[in-house]
Amino acid sequence: EFNVHVFDVCVAGGATQAQIGAQTVLVGGMDEMPVTAKELIGIYADEIIEAGPVGSGAALKIAVNVMTYAQFAAATTAHDLMTTTGGNPQALFNAWKHMGQLGTLTEQFSLLLDIPSEHFVGDFKEKMMTQVGISQKDLSLAMDLGWPRTGMVGFLQGIHDAMPNVYNAYGTEQ
Protein backbone atom coordinates (compact mmCIF):
# COMPACT_ATOMS: atom_id res chain seq x y z
CA GLU A 1 0.00 0.00 0.00
CA PHE A 2 2.84 2.45 0.82
CA ASN A 3 5.39 1.13 -1.72
CA VAL A 4 8.22 1.03 0.84
CA HIS A 5 11.73 -0.08 -0.15
CA VAL A 6 14.23 -1.34 2.43
CA PHE A 7 17.98 -1.13 1.99
CA ASP A 8 20.84 0.01 4.17
CA VAL A 9 23.29 2.81 3.57
CA CYS A 10 25.99 3.40 6.16
CA VAL A 11 28.20 6.47 6.01
CA ALA A 12 31.94 6.27 6.63
CA GLY A 13 34.05 9.34 7.12
CA GLY A 14 33.90 12.10 9.65
CA ALA A 15 33.13 15.79 9.63
CA THR A 16 36.22 16.67 7.59
CA GLN A 17 35.23 14.27 4.82
CA ALA A 18 31.67 15.61 4.88
CA GLN A 19 32.89 19.19 4.49
CA ILE A 20 34.87 18.32 1.37
CA GLY A 21 32.26 15.96 -0.10
CA ALA A 22 34.42 12.89 0.37
CA GLN A 23 32.04 10.60 2.26
CA THR A 24 32.05 6.89 1.57
CA VAL A 25 28.80 4.96 1.74
CA LEU A 26 28.55 1.23 2.32
CA VAL A 27 25.35 -0.04 0.73
CA GLY A 28 23.34 -3.19 1.26
CA GLY A 29 20.54 -3.98 -1.17
CA MET A 30 21.75 -1.75 -3.99
CA ASP A 31 20.36 -4.11 -6.64
CA GLU A 32 16.83 -3.51 -5.34
CA MET A 33 17.35 0.24 -4.85
CA PRO A 34 15.34 2.63 -7.04
CA VAL A 35 17.33 4.88 -9.37
CA THR A 36 16.21 7.98 -7.47
CA ALA A 37 17.66 6.61 -4.23
CA LYS A 38 20.97 5.82 -5.97
CA GLU A 39 21.06 9.37 -7.33
CA LEU A 40 20.43 10.79 -3.86
CA ILE A 41 23.30 8.77 -2.41
CA GLY A 42 25.55 10.01 -5.20
CA ILE A 43 24.97 13.60 -4.11
CA TYR A 44 26.74 13.25 -0.77
CA ALA A 45 29.13 10.37 -1.42
CA ASP A 46 32.21 10.34 -3.58
CA GLU A 47 32.61 6.58 -3.10
CA ILE A 48 29.76 4.07 -3.11
CA ILE A 49 30.69 0.53 -2.11
CA GLU A 50 28.20 -2.26 -2.78
CA ALA A 51 28.38 -4.69 0.12
CA GLY A 52 25.77 -7.27 -0.93
CA PRO A 53 22.13 -7.84 0.06
CA VAL A 54 20.21 -5.72 2.57
CA GLY A 55 22.08 -5.78 5.88
CA SER A 56 25.49 -6.10 4.28
CA GLY A 57 26.10 -2.34 4.32
CA ALA A 58 25.77 -2.28 8.10
CA ALA A 59 27.87 -5.43 8.45
CA LEU A 60 30.60 -3.85 6.30
CA LYS A 61 30.54 -0.69 8.44
CA ILE A 62 31.04 -2.76 11.60
CA ALA A 63 33.76 -4.86 9.92
CA VAL A 64 35.65 -1.73 8.83
CA ASN A 65 35.38 -0.36 12.37
CA VAL A 66 36.74 -3.63 13.81
CA MET A 67 39.78 -3.29 11.54
CA THR A 68 40.20 0.34 12.58
CA TYR A 69 40.06 -0.38 16.31
CA ALA A 70 42.45 -3.32 15.92
CA GLN A 71 44.91 -0.98 14.18
CA PHE A 72 44.51 1.65 16.91
CA ALA A 73 45.19 -0.99 19.58
CA ALA A 74 48.21 -2.29 17.66
CA ALA A 75 49.55 1.24 17.14
CA THR A 76 49.18 2.00 20.85
CA THR A 77 50.93 -1.23 21.84
CA ALA A 78 53.77 -0.72 19.34
CA HIS A 79 54.17 2.93 20.37
CA ASP A 80 54.43 1.91 24.02
CA LEU A 81 56.96 -0.79 23.13
CA MET A 82 59.14 1.82 21.44
CA THR A 83 58.90 4.37 24.26
CA THR A 84 59.45 1.90 27.11
CA THR A 85 62.60 0.55 25.43
CA GLY A 86 63.97 4.04 24.80
CA GLY A 87 63.26 3.89 21.09
CA ASN A 88 61.86 6.63 18.90
CA PRO A 89 58.15 6.00 18.30
CA GLN A 90 58.26 8.24 15.23
CA ALA A 91 60.66 5.73 13.65
CA LEU A 92 57.96 3.09 14.10
CA PHE A 93 55.37 5.13 12.23
CA ASN A 94 57.87 6.13 9.54
CA ALA A 95 58.69 2.45 8.96
CA TRP A 96 55.03 1.45 9.04
CA LYS A 97 54.16 4.16 6.54
CA HIS A 98 57.09 3.36 4.24
CA MET A 99 56.06 -0.30 4.12
CA GLY A 100 52.50 0.68 3.15
CA GLN A 101 50.97 -0.52 6.40
CA LEU A 102 49.93 2.83 7.88
CA GLY A 103 46.60 4.23 6.76
CA THR A 104 45.53 7.85 7.06
CA LEU A 105 43.11 7.28 9.95
CA THR A 106 45.62 5.35 12.05
CA GLU A 107 48.27 7.94 11.26
CA GLN A 108 45.94 10.67 12.53
CA PHE A 109 45.14 8.59 15.62
CA SER A 110 48.86 8.12 16.32
CA LEU A 111 49.17 11.83 17.11
CA LEU A 112 47.25 11.15 20.35
CA LEU A 113 49.89 8.69 21.50
CA ASP A 114 52.49 11.33 22.32
CA ILE A 115 50.12 13.36 24.50
CA PRO A 116 50.99 12.79 28.17
CA SER A 117 48.27 11.18 30.32
CA GLU A 118 47.98 14.23 32.55
CA HIS A 119 46.59 16.19 29.58
CA PHE A 120 43.64 13.81 29.20
CA VAL A 121 41.30 15.84 31.42
CA GLY A 122 38.05 17.77 31.16
CA ASP A 123 36.35 18.07 27.78
CA PHE A 124 39.23 16.35 26.01
CA LYS A 125 38.95 13.29 28.25
CA GLU A 126 35.17 13.31 27.77
CA LYS A 127 35.66 13.22 24.00
CA MET A 128 38.01 10.26 24.39
CA MET A 129 35.49 8.52 26.68
CA THR A 130 32.86 9.03 23.97
CA GLN A 131 35.21 7.35 21.46
CA VAL A 132 35.70 4.48 23.91
CA GLY A 133 31.93 4.03 24.15
CA ILE A 134 31.49 4.07 20.38
CA SER A 135 34.33 1.61 19.82
CA GLN A 136 33.12 -0.77 22.51
CA LYS A 137 29.57 -0.62 21.12
CA ASP A 138 30.85 -1.51 17.63
CA LEU A 139 33.10 -4.29 18.92
CA SER A 140 30.27 -5.77 21.01
CA LEU A 141 28.01 -5.66 17.98
CA ALA A 142 30.68 -7.43 15.91
CA MET A 143 30.89 -10.20 18.51
CA ASP A 144 27.09 -10.50 18.57
CA LEU A 145 26.61 -10.44 14.78
CA GLY A 146 29.38 -12.59 13.42
CA TRP A 147 30.70 -16.04 13.98
CA PRO A 148 34.43 -15.39 14.03
CA ARG A 149 36.91 -18.15 13.49
CA THR A 150 37.82 -20.26 16.48
CA GLY A 151 39.58 -18.16 19.10
CA MET A 152 38.77 -14.81 17.51
CA VAL A 153 35.99 -13.85 19.93
CA GLY A 154 38.68 -13.60 22.61
CA PHE A 155 40.72 -11.38 20.30
CA LEU A 156 37.74 -9.07 19.76
CA GLN A 157 36.99 -9.09 23.48
CA GLY A 158 40.61 -8.13 24.18
CA ILE A 159 40.42 -5.17 21.80
CA HIS A 160 37.07 -4.18 23.36
CA ASP A 161 38.52 -4.28 26.88
CA ALA A 162 41.65 -2.37 25.83
CA MET A 163 39.80 0.62 24.37
CA PRO A 164 39.98 2.80 27.52
CA ASN A 165 43.76 2.39 27.48
CA VAL A 166 43.99 2.79 23.70
CA TYR A 167 42.26 6.18 24.01
CA ASN A 168 44.10 6.99 27.27
CA ALA A 169 40.68 7.56 28.80
CA TYR A 170 40.66 5.15 31.72
CA GLY A 171 39.54 6.31 35.14
CA THR A 172 41.66 6.48 38.25
CA GLU A 173 41.21 2.72 38.67
CA GLN A 174 43.17 1.91 35.47
Model-predicted regions and their roles:
Residues 57-174:
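Helical "substrate-binding/catalytic lid" subdomain
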